[in-house]
C-alpha cells in the first residue's frame, strides 16, 4: 500500500505536467554534454567525443523516471562540426525517444576567441501504454488512453568560447508541437513548448603552479508557463584530472558531483541529487552516471 501511494503521487505529478507542457531533459552534469542543449557545441572540443549518461530518479521506487543519453560529436574539417544525440526517457507508462543530428560552424572572432553557430534537427518518438498501468483492481480513469506519435523538431544555438570561459544561448526544440488523441470523445493533449537555455562558465586559477582551478558555471532554463530554473554549478579541479563540487537547482534540488579522468581518453562522472520540493520530500535520491570517451 505504501508503494502504491508513491506510485499514485508520482503519476499525478507526471500527468499534470503532460496536460500542459513536457519538460525537456535535465542533466546535472551539463558542462560535460553541452551539445544536448546547444547544437553549436558540436565539434567545439576540437576532438571526437562519445558520451553516455544514465539518470535514475527516486531510486528504490519501481518504475520511477529514468533517462539514458548517448551523444557523439566530432569535427568535419577546420570550421565544421557534427553531432548525433539520442535521449531515451521513461516514466512509468510513458516513454520518449528523442533523436537529433547537429551541425555547427566556427567563426574565428580573434586569436583566442571562437564563435560557433549550430542547428539541430530530429524528432521525438512518444509512447504512452496505459495497458501497463497497475490499477490494483481500481477502475482506471477513462481519460487515460494510449498515445503513439512522432513529432519532428528543429533547434538552434550559438556558443562563444575562450580558453577560460564560455557563453551559450540555445533553443534546442523550437517547434511548439502537440500530441493529441481522441477516444470516444475524450481528448488527451500533451504539448512540447520551446525551451530557452542560457549558460556561462569560467575557470579561475587558484595557485601559481596552474594545476588547481575553481570552475563555476550557471545554466538557466525558461519555458512559457513554468518558473525559470537555474542550475548553479561549482567544481574544484585538480590538474583537470579530478573534479569535485556541487550543484543547486533553484526550488528543485541540490547535488554532489565528482569527475575523474581515468586516462587521457576516458572520463567517469557521478552526481548524487536530492530534491528540495515538499511534494517529493519522501522520495528517494537521484543518481546520474557519466561515461565519456575522447579520441
Go through the PLM ranges and name each one.
Residues 1-8:
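Bacterial N-terminal signal peptides that target proteins for export
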Residues 8-16:
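Bacterial N-terminal signal peptides
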Residues 22-295:
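Subset of outer-membrane beta-barrel
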Amino acid at each position: 500500500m505504501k508503494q502504491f501511494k508513491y506510485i499514485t503521487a508520482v503519476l499525478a505529478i507526471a500527468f499534470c505536467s503532460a496536460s500542459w507542457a513536457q519538460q525537456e531533459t535535465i542533466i546535472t552534469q551539463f558542462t560535460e554534454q553541452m551539445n544536448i542543449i546547444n547544437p553549436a557545441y558540436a565539434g567545439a572540443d576540437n576532438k571526437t567525443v562519445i558520451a553516455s549518461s544514465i539518470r535514475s530518479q527516486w531510486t528504490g521506487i519501481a518504475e520511477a523516471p529514468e533517462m539514458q543519453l548517448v551523444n557523439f560529436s566530432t569535427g568535419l574539417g577546420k570550421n565544421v562540426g557534427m553531432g548525433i544525440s539520442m535521449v531515451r526517457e521513461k516514466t512509468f507508462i510513458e516513454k520518449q525517444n528523442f533523436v537529433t543530428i547537429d551541425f555547427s560552424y566556427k567563426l574565428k572572432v580573434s586569436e583566442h576567441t571562437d564563435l560557433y553557430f549550430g542547428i539541430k534537427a530530429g524528432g521525438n518518438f512518444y509512447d504512452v501504454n496505459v495497458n501497463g498501468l497497475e490499477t490494483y483492481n481500481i477502475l482506471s480513469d477513462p481519460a487515460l488512453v494510449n498515445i503513439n506519435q512522432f513529432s519532428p523538431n528543429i533547434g538552434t544555438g550559438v556558443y562563444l568560447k575562450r580558453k577560460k570561459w564560455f557563453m551559450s544561448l540555445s533553443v534546442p526544440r523550437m517547434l511548439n508541437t502537440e500530441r493529441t488523441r481522441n477516444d470516444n470523445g475524450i481528448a488527451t493533449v500533451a504539448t512540447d513548448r520551446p525551451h530557452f537555455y542560457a549558460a556561462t562558465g569560467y575557470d579561475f586559477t587558484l595557485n601559481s603552479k596552474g594545476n588547481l582551478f575553481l570552475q563555476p558555471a550557471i545554466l538557466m532554463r525558461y519555458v512559457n508557463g513554468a518558473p525559470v530554473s537555474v542550475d548553479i554549478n561549482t567544481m574544484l579541479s585538480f590538474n583537470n584530472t579530478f573534479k569535485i563540487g556541487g550543484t543547486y537547482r533553484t526550488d528543485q534540488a541540490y547535488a554532489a558531483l565528482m569527475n575523474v579522468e581515468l586516462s587521457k581518453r576516458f572520463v567517469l562522472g557521478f552526481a548524487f541529487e536530492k530534491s528540495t520540493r515538499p511534494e517529493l520530500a519522501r522520495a528517494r535520491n537521484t543518481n546520474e552516471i557519466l561515461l565519456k570517451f575522447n579520441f
